[in-house]
Amino acid sequence: MRRPICGAIALLLSACTVSSAPPSVTLTVVVSPSASAIVAATPTPSPSPGATPRPDPPVAAADADALAVQMVSAERAVRDQSVTGADLAWFGHLQQLTYRRLAATPELRDTVLAEMPSDLKTAATANADATADLRATVVPGPDLPSAWRIVEPAPLEDLARYYREAEAEFGVPWSYLAAIHLVETRMGRIRGTSTAGAQGPMQFIPATWARYGDGDINSDRDSIRAAARYLRANGAPANMANALFRYNQSQRYVRAVTAYAEVMRADPDAYRGYYQWQVYYLTTRGDILLPVGYGR
């Protein structure tokens, strides 16, 4: 179907060749080797008067023990149905940053994962592996993407319904559609054409869309259906690895999407966390958060 991986992953991580452009919002370097440690031990929806406010955005800890505490806290919170709204968003963001920290400082990996409780170890290992795989596909550059806009995603419940509807229609597991959506555009947050010409929330080349698409390439629902149709035509659900490789010809991409998908298949509540993940751009200055409003 597709383009080289550098132009496809909406880059969640980095750039291929982009020109610098002054953003219209304030940008923050969030993950860097010198970042200070902030530990969130338990979900705390409403801090008491006089309590130290939690950082926004969250900050991943720099040492292994504190990072493990953050990771467990975030993984527990996103699976807790009583954690909603701004608290869910914050803990989902923290979850993302803990894995980005591991990918950026792999020497912490074994110590951190060894501290995961047994019920979280499989998911934590999968998330760590997927983040490392995606990070390995890109090379940091000095500039930010000039052709991107960052927007609010469609509501969590709406996207979940689109994935389930596409699964019912084409037989492709909903979790794989959600994982592709996550990797390609952070579930629709990134708007803009990739360096290889891919468009829309599921990043279709126009020629492929002409064959498999129906409706609006920029519609979450329509592009999710098209992705399911394309995957089905290439072996899904019986041979998901082949279907994913045809979607994007990188074994790292296949492994990463599969890892996220299988975490959600094993525990659908994991989707609540992934939905909160934000758009980061890996540069020579570090990880840059591109917030909603960037590029407008």
Regions found by a protein language model. Name each.
Residues 185:
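Conserved alpha-helical segments that form or flank metal/cofactor-binding pockets of metalloenzymes
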Residues 106-111, 171-179, 192, 236-247, ...:
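Surface-exposed patches in mature extracellular/periplasmic domains of secreted proteins
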Residues 195-201:
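Extracytoplasmic ligand-binding site segments that recognize negatively charged/polar headgroups
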Residues 90, 94, 179-182, 226, ...:
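Amphipathic alpha-helical interaction segments
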Residues 169-173, 197, 290-291:
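Extracellular/periplasmic catalytic domains that process cell-envelope and extracellular macromolecules
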Residues 150, 154-169, 175, 188, ...:
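Alpha-helical segment that forms one wall of the substrate-binding/catalytic cleft
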Residues 1-165, 251, 259-296:
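Cell-wall glycan-active module
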